[in-house]
Amino acid sequence: IWKGLVGSEMCIRDRTYMLPSLHHGGFVTCEPCDVPVNKRHLDMLLAHMTLSDKPHLGAITEMSRAQDSVDMAEIVFGKEVMDANCVIMGNVNTNSPLLVDKVVTEAARAYSSRGQGMVVVPFILSGAMGPVSTAASVAQAMAEAMMVCAYIQLLRPGAPFVLGNFLSSMSLKSGAPTFGMPELSLIHI
């Protein structure tokens, strides 16, 4: 049926498609390391677009890949539908503390300028890339996400924006990430 999707990739994508509790296909289900990097995103997008009816994300790792994702979505949905609806989104992380890099700004430009959505998820380990206190880490995450939101709205007012966060802490003794600590339940409320 399609040369680029075989073996475990096909199996994983089939499982994602068949589970009714999974409402989204994501983007990188399984990294196809046997495909050249400059073409990998095209194969993954084609698989999502032809083998599943679930929404999915697009590529963000380079401006051309983000643009390819938006262009492929336009081929599938048409310009009129795409102008009126968000049909694909990109998911980016800020580089804490308080840095929005080239990858984020270029992906935001590719998606938002065409009215497509961006999911922005600051990744902060309290005590390493952010303040030790829970409240200060949340404030930093909000500031980082709002920087990207403001940029997106400058590019195209009203462009869709989803704010997420990935906040955790680290042991100040060992430096190891400490997932599952009680502070995190307060952060994700």
Regions found by a protein language model. Give the residues of each.
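Residue-level signal for functionally critical sites in structured catalytic/ligand-binding pockets
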Residues: 1, 5, 48, 144, ...
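Single conserved hydrophobic/aromatic residue that forms the stacking wall/gate
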Residues: 1-7, 12, 187-188
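Catalytic alpha/beta active-site cores
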Residues: 8-9, 13-131, 135
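Glycine-rich anion/phosphate-binding loop at the beta-strand->alpha-helix junction
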Residues: 91-187
